[in-house]
């Protein structure tokens, strides 16, 4: 019994650092955020009283909230399928041409080596109305980030590009994990390459696709960096306002911690609801070997 107690104590000691980290930086902020959403919080972050549902009524009644929610859901609806289609296509290309695979891996994982702030500055220069290469190639004269009509599309392109590298590696690893005898059997049976992709390879890598699908949705819901770094608080920033960028501006620019807490709780509930639905869908469409 003493040996078992000592063993459990050793395990607890090894787990203690990560448990402390989780409590201090994950669980406490999460609980405090819930408390703030129902409280009157001053500019110093001090709770001054109980607000009930007043913060929620105020947040959901703001004119900019529906637009921020719409932009957040739109980014998720476009970003997730676009990233999946692009990364699966690139992985299939790299997996097919093994001799050029090292070159493809270097090129397609390049976004991983660029920080978000640097990528924002690069894309802002590329989409510049005066010196941008995008306007030069297509013969346009658009201020992509300066126009309310195109700012969100430009931010979307940036977020998709930033997410390609890591997801490409996951898809490529999954494809290379398919047993070679299965692929050989499809060739012997005379199955066309296109049918092999949709009937054999994609079903076999469906667990990886499901993982990328869920994580990309969460990341898309949390998208705020391009909107904050590039758009800032300009007049055009409303065209790219999301729940997270609105939360950032409320918490760090306006010190309205009650509003920021409600926005973060809203994003959390939406993400949690989608995740639950995804796992229900997983039982029917995801095939584990």
Predicted regions and their residues:
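A structural signal for multi-pass alpha-helical bundles of membrane permease subunits
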Residues: 4-289
């Amino acid at each position: 019994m003493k040996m078992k107690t000592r063993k459990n104590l050793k395990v607890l000691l090894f787990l203690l650092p990560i448990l402390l980290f989780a409590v201090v930086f994950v669980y406490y902020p999460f609980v405090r955020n819930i408390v703030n959403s129902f409280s009157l919080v001053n500019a110093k972050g001090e709770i001054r009283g109980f607000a009930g549902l007043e913060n929620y009524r105020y947040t959901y009644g703001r004119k900019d909230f529906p637009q921020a929610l719409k932009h957040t859901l739109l980014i998720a609806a476009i970003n997730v399928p676009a990233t999946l289609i692009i990364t699966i296509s690139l992985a299939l290309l790299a997996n097919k041409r093994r001799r050029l695979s090292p070159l493809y891996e270097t090129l397609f994982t390049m976004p991983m080596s660029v920080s978000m702030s640097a990528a924002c500055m690069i894309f802002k220069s590329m989409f510049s109305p005066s010196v941008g290469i995008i306007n030069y190639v297509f013969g346009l004269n658009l201020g992509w980030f300066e126009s309310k009509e195109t700012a969100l599309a430009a931010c979307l392109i940036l977020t998709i590009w930033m997410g390609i590298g890591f997801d490409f590696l996951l898809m490529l690893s999954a494809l290379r994990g398919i047993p070679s005898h299965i692929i050989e059997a499809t060739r012997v049976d005379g199955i066309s390459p296109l049918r092999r992709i949709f009937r054999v390879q994609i079903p076999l890598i469906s667990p990886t696709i499901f993982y990328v699908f869920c994580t990309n949705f969460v990341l898309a819901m949390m998208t705020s960096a391009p909107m904050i770094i590039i758009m800032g608080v300009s007049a055009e920033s409303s065209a790219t306002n999301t729940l997270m960028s609105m939360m950032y501006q409320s918490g760090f620019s306006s010190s309205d911690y009650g509003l920021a807490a409600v926005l973060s709780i809203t994003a959390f509930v939406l993400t949690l609801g989608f995740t639950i639905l995804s796992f229900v869908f997983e039982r029917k469409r995801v095939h584990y070997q």
